[in-house]
Amino acid sequence: MDNIIRFSVSLPSQLLDELDKKVSEQGYASRSEFTRDLIREKIVNDSWKDAKEELIGVLTLIYVHHQNDLINKMMDIEHDADVTIICTNHVHVDHHNCLETITLRGEAAKIEHFSDRIAGLKGVKFAKLTKAAVPKF
């Protein structure tokens, strides 16, 4: 691990109260741990802007599995994808709805394009792309 450098941050008291509440609710050992996670998250999100290196994304979907031809359209998009599909996980939520996660690897723009194509299909009720990258720090 790198050397830890201490620095100070000035916050309005109300914001500090909210910070302390989040630290406690989420079980962080300290404000520093919480702050480090926030900084890492910001760096990862910013790394997606115009990134050309290989990144990771997880597309979470909820869809109606009885929707006409939805599964076939999803499969066509997956098979034609310009990204690597690392794995998929399928859960039957109830008789009508399925939850699926698709773990993707590739360039940011290509992952986002893939996700947008799937999310736009009729019968997809919810779609969220979680952006990830292996921090270089």
UniProtKB/Swiss-Prot annotation:
Its cofactor is Ni(2+). Binds 1 nickel ion per subunit. GO terms for biological process: response to nickel cation. It holds the Pfam family RHH_1. SUPFAM superfamilies: ACT-like (SSF55021), Ribbon-helix-helix (SSF47598). Keywords: DNA-binding, Metal-binding, Nickel, Transcription, Transcription regulation. Ni(2+) binds at H79, H90, H92, C98. Transcriptional regulator. Belongs to the transcriptional regulatory CopG/NikR family. This is Putative nickel-responsive regulator.
